[in-house]
Amino acid sequence: MSDITAIEQEALAAIAAAADLAALDAVRVAELGKKGRVSALMGALGKMSPDERKAQGPQLNALKTRVDDAIRLRKDVLENAALEARLVTERVDLTLPPAAGPGEGALHPVMQVFEEIAAIFGDMGFTVAEGPDIEDDWHNFTALNFPIGHPARETHDTFFMKALEGDTPKVLRTHTSPVQVRTMMEEKPPIRILVPGRVYRNDWDATHTPMFHQVEGLVIEKGIHMGHLKGCLIDFVKAFFEVDNVESRFRPHFFPFTEPSAEMDVKYSRNGDAIEIGAGDRWMEILGCGMVHPNVLRNCGIDPAVHQGFAFGMGVDRLAMLKYGMPDLRPYFEADPQWSRHYGFSPWLTPSVSGGLS
């Protein structure tokens, strides 16, 4: 408890002392980033005994919430101060000539990659399925085998919407997996779907945004096994990155909704900011996958003794970064015409496996 109190005091002091947004973001990364102090304490919960988790969990969740709230409040103060300073110094020159009219538009890289992924999996027999961005707790968590108390159910990871009295609480979906649940409940196997869409998580830095794009896939049939999953994803990676030889590996991992679960890594090389998939001797994780958990199948009315399946999920924004060399996610959402002209694609060219993706 003393360690938690000391970390909180130090974190709050550092937040209060942050003189600008860059300094505040450095504090956020140091405390709440993947390798931050608070995140490290949260990660240690999984190694504790049930009694220790019961005692330490609420304290650590409260610590993370207080630090996160303090960062948000300080960010508002700093942003308002920066805006005031900008308004004092900026002037609009009304004598300037009007800007030239818009030229031909460009397809955003995210949409281009969506189309490329759909073309590849469409060639494998997948159809596209979609669902609502606002979900209830059952479809987003419970049906997918997320236990009560799982960190993803906390407010620092998920955007919860204020529920009307007597109404079921709603969330901005944290993944497109609820569409898999809805499809399994509405359709009978065999099922082979691709699920693209926007998802929402409470994070913001060079490689994470509060809203991002995800594609998931689901196959439910008789006799499906891990070999089918591996073959499907290896073929996808070769087609997407347009290379014939890709060395890959599947590392054991944990996801509540799959068992066994894995993360797929591919070998790559780096030359400055340029990344080449299929060369070099470094490993990079590109997606998560696994065999659909029997509990998820049962929740959706499918007998796991008769039908099996696999699922996978990947971040479209990150795949676009890797394939087309964009170093930062944040410009994706800034509507900068110069950025769009540089990284955009012709809207008249439709990707296809036979005709070429990009």
From Swiss-Prot:
A Pfam family annotated for this UniProt entry: tRNA-synt_2d
Annotated Gene Ontology cellular component terms: cytoplasm
Enzyme class: ligase
Assigned keywords, A-Z: Aminoacyl-tRNA synthetase, ATP-binding, Cytoplasm, Ligase, Magnesium, Metal-binding, Nucleotide-binding, Protein biosynthesis
EC number: 6.1.1.20
Any one of the GO BP annotations: phenylalanyl-tRNA aminoacylation
PROSITE patterns noted in UniProt: AA_TRNA_LIGASE_II (PS50862)
Ligand binding (Mg(2+)): 259
GO molecular-function term, one example from the UniProt record: tRNA binding
Quaternary structure annotation from Swiss-Prot or TrEMBL: Tetramer of two alpha and two beta subunits.
Family the UniProt entry places it in: Belongs to the class-II aminoacyl-tRNA synthetase family. Phe-tRNA synthetase alpha subunit type 1 subfamily.
Name of the protein this chain belongs to: Phenylalanine--tRNA ligase alpha subunit
Name of the gene this protein is made from: pheS
